[in-house]
Amino acid sequence: AVMFTKNTEEAGGNHWAVYHHKNTSAPETDYLKLSDDTATADNADIWNDTEPTSAIFTAGDHSGSNRSGDDFISYHWNEVQGFSKFSSFVGNGNVDGTFVYTGFRPAFVMIRRSSSTGNWIIFDNKRNTFNVVSNALFANANSAEGDLASNTPLDFTSNGFKLRNSDLTGDTNINLSGSTYIYMAFAEAPFVNSNGVPCNAR
């Protein structure tokens, strides 16, 4: 499960608090901020130290999720086989990078390093209609689209995505050796359609 929650009344420094079930070994006590590149924050209050279910999420005594009298907005996603996948992977620092299996050809992938600081990096199949997928947007920044083609970030395949990056460093990298990354992926087409026919690679 993934949740984006925002206090719409908090003055100054307000942010989107992000829950991702693969963020850490205890994601119910941790959160990331969609609005910046800071590392995971450890706070048992934000989700009341409670893992969400398919029907209920719990907010504790925290200004980012449940301050008394304030209004909040919250968006929630759950995995649907063949259509959405929210998980994690470990980078290997090589141009022959990690392959991430999703079970579908992606239309949209957002990646964030969870083991340290890092940008929320977005790739999709509309701005790059064929491989290599290199036109990146950053959810936490107001900068223009970045073309990362010289570093060949990733390929979209019929059943996931393949990292191709070894040169970028720090917050713009999606494949640092030993670093853990979380991602959200939504499908263009399932690996196998409703008739049992495999979809084509790009």
Regions from the PLM with identified roles:
Residues 1-202:
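Surface-exposed molecular-recognition determinants
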